[in-house]
Amino acid sequence: MTTVLIVDDHPTFRATARMLLEAEGYDVVGEAPDGNSGIVAAGELHPDLVLLDVNLPDLDGFSVAQRITANQGAPAVVLTSSRDSSDFGPLVAGSGARGFISKGELSGAAIAELL
């Protein structure tokens, strides 16, 4: 079972994403409300995947993704936002993330395509 850490500053989205992913067979092992706590949680929990919001209150998701993926054995990172991927272009590719899924398109199948 793929383990997941959800990093997003909106508790409602974290709860919705948790329910959706758990219903599709993922094991959500943690949640974090901002970039710094997400980096710490990724190091402590060792998830297979970090679902990471682009817009966080302390750090942007692109820099968080770079920090998480810089370590050997790092989890896969998938960026997400309520905005469309075309708004971010090369920032996604340069972040070390596997890809981007808009929040409205989030599903286990969409994540599996990126892993």
Kindly label every feature range from the protein language model.
Residues 46-49, 72-76:
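His-Asp phosphorelay/catalytic-motif detector in bacterial-type signaling
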Residues 11-30:
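Two-component/phosphorelay signaling modules centered on CheY-like receiver
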Residues 63, 83-101, 105, 109:
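Alpha4 helix (beta4-alpha4-beta5 surface) of REC/receiver domains from two-component response regulators
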Residues 79-80:
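Hydrophobic/aromatic residues positioned on beta-strands within the core alpha/beta folds
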Residues 34-37, 60-63:
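Acidic catalytic/metal-coordinating carboxylates
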Residues 52-53:
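Active-site T/S-Asp motif of two-component receiver
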Residues 57:
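The feature encodes the CheY-like receiver
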Residues 62-73:
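Short amphipathic alpha-helix used as the core "switch/output" element in two-component signaling
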